Each structure stands twice: as structure tokens, then as C-alpha cells.
């Protein structure tokens, strides 16, 4: 949570320019430096370090932050299996679940750090790792209708897909809301970094199937096939991730399509800004009603800090768009 807290503080500083907020952010950020100095233990290195140190470097240009990012990117890349073509997400699940090489959709979020490192003094190989991971995931981790599996399990000898399953979703055959959100955000970033039109096309396909199935207020149920709909819990974190992604994606597309995505993002934010999803003074968080891990009975209908992070990011992106600025600062 130190990473997400650091990230939220930095986003608040970005809006307020209050130096006290930046100092609080630095305290949380510095507590994560050790992650750049130890062997990679799972895929979350990218999210933990790039959101904290990446935003920190963007705002301060502190060279110490840059070194941490570059070292962590090298560490993350050690999880890459060239036979499979993706990074291993959860080494801890290899033996207990008999998942020889597992890649989760969340891992798409970590590619941004690899792209950044490759063009900011890191090993150019990191770019190739990110592209390979995106390509293999695109080929193997989606159904014909462009809904995603949470987990792809691969054979380490042949590199072939063994099966697609869920871990945090309702069932292997269903669309877990935040997993699809990671895909939308991830492929938007891959297009930004490569300018390869196949990723732009794919980002739209995974977005459209998500948008088509949303309830009226544009905040998804935690899984699109969750039991108990319409009374099933919503996932505000997924809505925040998608809103932020669509504000960027909209800028890469012609007016009609781009406006449709931008308008959808604005509707999502309008719902998240409403009393139905705002915590007010009841909690230290901004947003209520996220779901972390339903099958594990963890963080159900809860406030989750990364929901706040992407919510604030989306609000800042919308502000920049309204001011006629580049959505990516």
C-alpha cells in the first residue's frame, strides 16, 4: 500500500502544488527502494515502483528515482521466459497450482515501466520483452469475443498455452471486470509506446466488449457474470482504470470514435463522483464499492487505494484534455 499511497499523494501534489503533500509522498516512496535491490518475486514490481518512483521522477527529476526505476525494470525482466514469450506473474503459484508459467492480465500494467526504461538509458532489450509479452498475451489470453482470461497457463518447454483460467473472477469462462480493465489500459499504453496500429485496433476491441455490457451507471459488477446481478457488488476500481485509459485512448482516434470513448469516460467519472460511490467523511478513501478478490473473500465492497489512484489520474487527465493539453504529461 506504500506505493499506492505515494502515488495518490503525488497526484494530489500535481493538482495542488502543495509541497507538504510532496514531502509525504516521498516518505512512502522511499520505503519501496528495497524492491530495486532484491530478486523479482512477482509481476507487481512494475506497479509498485513505476507508479511511485515513475511519478516521482516525472515531477522532481531526482536522478536517484531514475536509478531505482532502471534497476527494477532489469529485475522485472528476469521473470521473462523467451520460450513462452511472456513474463511469469506469480512464481509462488507454479507448484501449488501446477501452473508451470502463469501470466495474469494485471501484468499488462507493468509493461509501461519496461518501455520507459528502454528509452531512458536502460537496456533496449526491455522494449523487446514488453512487445513480446503484449503479443503473446494478445494471441492467447483472450476469447474470440475479446473478453479476457485472468490467467494464462503456459508450457515452459513448448511455450504453448495450456489453459486460460480465472483467479479473482467468478469462473474461467467469465469476464472479470478489473482484468478487462487492465487489458484496456495496457494495450492503450502499448500503442502509445510502439505506434503499431494493431495495438490500437486491439485496444478498441477489448474496450467495446466491456462498454457493451456495462450497467446504466457505467460502473461494472465485479464480474460481468457475477451471481446476484443486479444486486452483486460493483467494482469502482475497474471503472476508474477504464475511465483513465479511455481518456488517453480517445486522443489516438478519429473524432467520432474518440468522442465516444471520451464521453464514456466522462459518464464513468460522473458516477464515481456521485454520492453513490464517494466516501465523503466516512472513510479516508475517495471511493467506495470496489472488489479486490471475491473468490478469496477479500476486499469485497471495499475501499481500495489503487481505485483512488486511477480515479485521481483520470480526473487529472480530463482536466488536461479540457485545457487543450496532452493527456499524458
Locate each region found by the language model.
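Long, well-ordered core segments of solenoidal/helical folds
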Residues: 20-40, 69-89, 129-149, 155-166, ...
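Single conserved hydrophobic/aromatic residue that forms the stacking wall/gate
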Residues: 1-5, 9
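CBM-like carbohydrate-recognition segments
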Residues: 64-67, 231-329
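Structural helix-adjacent loops and short alpha-helical linkers that scaffold large soluble proteins
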Residues: 12-26, 57-70, 118-131, 191-204, ...
Amino acid at each position: 500500500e506504500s506505493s499506492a499511497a505515494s502515488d495518490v499523494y503525488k497526484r494530489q501534489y500535481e493538482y495542488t502544488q502543495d509541497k507538504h503533500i510532496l514531502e509525504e509522498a516521498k516518505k512512502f516512496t522511499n520505503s519501496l527502494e528495497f524492491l530495486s535491490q532484491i530478486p523479482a518475486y512477482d509481476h507487481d514490481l512494475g506497479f509498485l515502483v513505476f507508479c511511485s518512483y515513475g511519478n516521482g521522477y516525472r515531477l522532481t527529476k531526482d536522478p536517484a528515482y531514475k536509478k531505482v526505476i532502471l534497476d527494477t525494470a532489469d529485475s522485472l525482466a528476469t521473470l521473462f521466459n523467451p520460450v513462452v514469450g511472456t513474463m511469469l506473474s506469480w512464481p509462488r503459484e507454479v507448484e501449488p497450482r501446477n501452473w508451470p508459467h502463469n501470466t495474469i492480465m494485471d501484468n499488462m500494467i507493468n509493461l509501461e515501466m519496461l518501455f520507459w526504461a528502454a528509452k531512458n538509458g536502460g537496456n533496449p532489450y526491455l522494449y523487446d520483452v514488453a512487445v513480446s509479452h503484449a503479443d503473446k498475451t494478445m494471441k492467447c489470453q483472450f476469447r474470440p469475443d475479446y473478453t479476457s482470461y485472468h490467467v494464462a497457463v503456459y508450457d515452459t518447454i513448448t511455450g504453448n498455452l495450456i489453459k486460460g483460467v480465472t483467479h479473482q473472477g467468478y469462473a474461467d469462462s467469465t469476464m472479470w471486470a478489473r482484468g478487462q480493465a487492465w487489458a484496456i489500459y495496457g494495450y492503450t499504453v502499448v500503442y502509445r509506446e510502439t505506434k503499431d496500429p494493431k495495438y490500437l485496433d486491439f485496444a478498441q476491441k477489448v474496450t467495446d466488449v466491456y462498454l457493451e455490457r456495462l450497467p446504466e451507471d457505467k460502473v461494472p459488477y465485479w464480474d460481468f457474470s457475477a451471481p446476484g446481478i443486479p444486486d452483486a457488488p460493483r467494482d469502482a476500481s475497474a471503472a476508474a482504470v477504464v475511465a483513465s485509459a479511455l481518456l488517453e485512448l480517445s486522443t489516438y482516434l478519429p473524432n467520432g470514435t474518440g468522442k465516444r470513448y471520451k464521453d464514456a469516460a466522462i459518464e464513468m467519472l460522473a458516477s464515481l463522483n456521485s454520492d453513490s460511490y464517494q466516501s465523503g467523511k466516512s472513510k479516508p478513501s475517495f471511493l467506495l464499492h470496489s472488489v479486490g478478490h471475491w473468490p478469496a473473500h477479500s476486499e469485497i465492497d471495499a475501499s481500495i487505494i489503487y481505485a483512488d489512484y486511477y480515479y485521481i489520474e483520470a480526473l487529472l487527465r480530463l482536466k488536461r484534455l479540457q485545457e487543450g493539453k496532452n493527456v499524458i504529461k
